[in-house]
Amino acid sequence: YTTLFRSVGFSGQMHGLVPLDRQGQPVRKAIIWCDARSVDEVEDIRRLLGNERLGEITCNQIAAGFQTASLLWMKKHEPALYEKTETVLLPKDYLRYRLTGCLSTDVTDAAGTLALNVRQAAWSDELIRTLGLRRSLYPKIYLPQDFAGEVTAAASAETGLKAGTKVFHGGADQVMQAIGNGIIAPGQ
């Protein structure tokens, strides 16, 4: 059946942390959204930025398990792994990277990291700098419908998907669910 696919898009869980080294290999196991180890880092973020400023930048409430809080936890508790990290991805972005070699994210998933200036649809240099993180860790941001690449020969051998199959960025699970339910305009 995999030869019938003309393209692949992704919808995946938000907020997780998949840190990659220079060779694109994970430096540790992923920390997903429901992992609450970063509760102290959440308080650090609130202390450094304040809830009001954080809300102005991210349009989000903060919780343990969000990528930025998990990254701060890693920096504090696993400094050697943090230093080896060259790029941070979200879980679905890691899967797309494995299929295509494209290190990137989409704006809907980036909005759940607590590092995105949502109004500008760009990484918040202010937030990243204030928290003492490296801006270079964050990948390029695309729209969900943007082309990411094609399934590589290596990914084809692992998955059975035909090499050359087009892959699109896709989006965060809650956003894609809303679109699937027809919620596409204000007030719906």
Give the predicted meaning of each segment:
Residues 180-186:
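Alpha-helix C-terminal capping segments
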Residues 8:
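Acidic/charged, solvent-exposed loop-and-adjacent secondary-structure segments enriched in E/D, K/R, S/T
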Residues 12-14:
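Short, small/polar residue-rich loop motifs at catalytic or cofactor-binding pockets
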Residues 1-4:
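Short, small-residue-biased leader/transition segments that mark boundaries at the very start
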Residues 16-19, 176-179:
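Short beta-strand scaffold segments in enzyme catalytic cores
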Residues 54-172:
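Gly/Ser/Thr-rich active-site cleft segment
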Residues 40-44, 177-179:
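Pocket-flanking alpha-helical
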Residues 35:
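Carbohydrate-associated surface elements
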